[in-house]
């Protein structure tokens, strides 16, 4: 199978990879020395303030030294899990950082990027920042993917196809058959980026792992994941991408900042990834509560999109912003959607049972007041 050319901007090709030097671990392993004086990166020998050490007693060298710019330990663990090479994994300051990196690497002025709509706004925003044109494929009236419109958009040979699966904010998803049709229709020069921020919640045989589907295609592709949702590390800002091959991943690495994921985030993500018990508990809670919340909202007469995420997207039957404001006054924070054509919709996260009860009670109060 012929390897398609890389859809990379010439400006990125001309940038040499950043040389961050060797880490302490690399020097010890390569040169077999125990004591190493790291005097290459202008770090403070005293380390962080004692106030920080009181907050985090074991922070030590994690805060004093620059992190591994490649996040090698975490990348190796992720690569093994996805059965890819280590150099096919890239880390980001949240997966949204990688959306920006990919757009900086690929999108030229005038290029077309196909997205699903409504979707995560940054898919469109970073395209626009690079001078690209967004080709929206709007969901059907039942809030599922419009496959005819999507395949028609793909047939126009865009520079990139970027979408979330499951979709944020709707919650619906492409099935294995639908994803296979998308892949079969793609031009070899089109980069496909599947944002799987909510994949851990997408239980069932009707949800495909994009990496497993794409690995055998020979296409240029990226699958994005995050530690912010099911792994509970939103405040640490760390996500990752699985890339079709090391060569393409190398170009993306040139477009990111060298130390875009901090050392604490890297070690925390590695620990979280290996704690499958906690992950399973988190997902199970979300799925059970999602179904309970869905029934409650349906009983109240609301129209709810199908969801494989840790949230529900429902039609408030009136402008959503005033409803959200009324909920705020009752101590509940939800997200009214403001993209055109969906201004009556609210996205509500699945919280703890107590939080979810608080929301339902508050929504009933808002309804009663009118």
From Swiss-Prot:
SUPFAM superfamilies cross-referenced by the UniProt entry: PLP-dependent transferases (SSF53383)
EC number: 2.6.1.9
Keywords, ordered alphabetically: Amino-acid biosynthesis, Aminotransferase, Histidine biosynthesis, Plasmid, Pyridoxal phosphate, Transferase
Pfam families in UniProt: Aminotran_1_2 (PF00155)
PROSITE patterns tied to this protein: AA_TRANSFER_CLASS_2
Catalytic activity field: L-histidinol phosphate + 2-oxoglutarate = 3-(imidazol-4-yl)-2-oxopropyl phosphate + L-glutamate
Residue positions where N6-(pyridoxal phosphate)lysine is found in the record: 229
Protein name: Histidinol-phosphate aminotransferase 3
Organism field: Rhizobium meliloti (strain 1021)
